[in-house]
Amino acid sequence: MKQTKIVASISDRRCDQDFIRKLFFAGMNVVRMNTAHASEEGIRTIVNNVRAVSPHIGILIDTKGPEVRTTGVKEPIHYNIGDVVKIFGRPEMDSSHDIVNLSYPNITDDVKVGDDLLFDDGELDMKVIENTGPMLVAQVQNEGTLGAHKSVNVPGEHIDLPALTEKDCRNILLAIELDIDFIAHSFVRSAADVKAVQDILDEHHSDIKIISKIENQEGVDNIDEIIEASYGIMIARGDLGIEVPIEKIPGIQRRIIAKCIKAKKPVIVATQMLHTMIHNPRPTRAEVTDIANAIFYRTDALMLSGETASGKYPLEAVQTMARIAEQAEKDKSPVNDIDPMEEGYIDQKLFLAHAAIEATQKLGVKGIITDGETGQTARDLAAFRGPNPVLAICYKEKLQRWLNLSYGVIPIVQKDQISTKAMFTAAVRMLRQKGYLEAEDKIAYLSGSFGEGGGTTFVEINKVRKIFDNSYSFNLPSNGIEDK
């Protein structure tokens, strides 16, 4: 069984329950919705169908974030090298061959002569040769075609747009209403952009978790403060590969993953992981290697975009990614391990998590069980990227869904208030039934002696057979609930 989590993008054009169920059984852990391509009605349909399939599937919704786009065109416009174009910030006017209008009125304030304007994910490049104040004059650098409402990137420049659009604010309120689990905020440039979303969530007493999408140089430069302000990070390599030199992407990816592990926060690698499978039933060797390398770098999760949202082989894409992940996890080298413990800093719960992981290697422990109200202990354990699964007992379904982004964590819900001993033995029994444990295997239990808010205080290690053979004399620290 794979330990790397899979996020799959789903469109309202293909979101029936049978389709979602197939992806779920194939290995999908979280459904992602792209608000750039979904109406409110479509979002509601996706959420209702996902919840009908299983309350255990996480749901993530994107914001559009601060972006610049072209305006409408009557028909696609063809450009040749050397064509000269006037560019205005006039969102209310359509574009033509000689005049391109953009959605951002103040574009001339933020762009200088010599900058490249990259249209449609970098497909068309225009270099600015003059800035008159009211308009830019640019020269086309490559032959290409420009359609309506295409993306515009200006590598190396700060575009002074607000962190949230009006549509973003409406979609955040919709996410709160629908009790969605994650908001993936696009084009995050600093902690202030994360705070803009968090302020809305706080105002409405929502516990939705924020995933910050790193898509430009500013986000890379400010990654430490962004990680601190976020629940998790998505390395969105599409726009990132336009905004920064593409040869820098692997190194940026590796460094961000390492920083997230140090912070004990989930990290997702996204974009073009199995892009070929939008149209073909098999991936390229390079795509297989890309997925494996993300796992060798120690990512928590991988994301599929067009492969599952609009591709011809969505189920096969999830199945393929799951198979590659499972094999890559077996092939990982310890030389790439990242120690989440800060040198010179001793934290009790992290020390105990490290001890439990060490036990899997030195004492042959086959699995770790933990429980808690926040999932922090499970995320601490996930940061060590241990070889065996972590079973996290969750006391609410939402926590279970939040942990669907954490490597190696199997979250299950325990709604009934039962004793520590009863909960632990039930968890061991479940692991045995699922084939993770044999009678002679050792199991570790990481928990606290003082109930909710009391912190992690002990590690229990025992043989499965011994636990059940001595059920009357076997004891654990009490959580205040007596065995019946």
Q: What do these predicted regions represent?
A:
Residues 1-484:
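Non-catalytic helical/linker scaffolds that mediate oligomerization, partner binding
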